[in-house]
Amino acid sequence: MIINPENVPNRTTTIYPQEFKSLVLGRVKKAVGNAAGLKNFGVNLVTLAPGSCSALRHWHTRQDEFIYVLEGEVTLVTNEGAQILQPGMMAGFPAGEDNGHHLVNRSQAAVVYLEIGDRTADDEAHYPDNDLMARASADGWILTHKDGTLYES
């Protein structure tokens, strides 16, 4: 199926609790994989405004992630530190590797990249820099503090 990204709705919402939502302001996702009817993995066309980030720094227990930079210069932050990615560069994040990652737009121009991830069940996302855990369920993500108490929605 051919997808014109201009026909895919913008998504600016986040599952994060209120105290973390401001960190992803300026992030716009288009679920182009869903628009194509994909079921086993997701593909998002993501735009980050200057100063925005892709997510809180995190890693997944069961789901692989991959990004491909299309436009702009973005900073990848991992356990190893910060690295600049430019158009054509890619990065992969294998499931189960305790190496939190996220992208930060520290430039003065928009960044556009593809974000690809599988949809393996029973995944957990760990956020090493924040008091947050996420566990996948049939109804979406369950967000808790690291001590297991639920965030109130």
Identify the function of each model-found stretch.
Residues 79-96:
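Short acidic-glycine-tyrosine-enriched beta hairpin
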Residues 26-31, 44-60, 98:
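Conserved short histidine dyad/triad with adjacent acidic residue
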Residues 45-49, 60-77, 116-118:
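Short, conserved beta-strand element in jelly-roll/cupin
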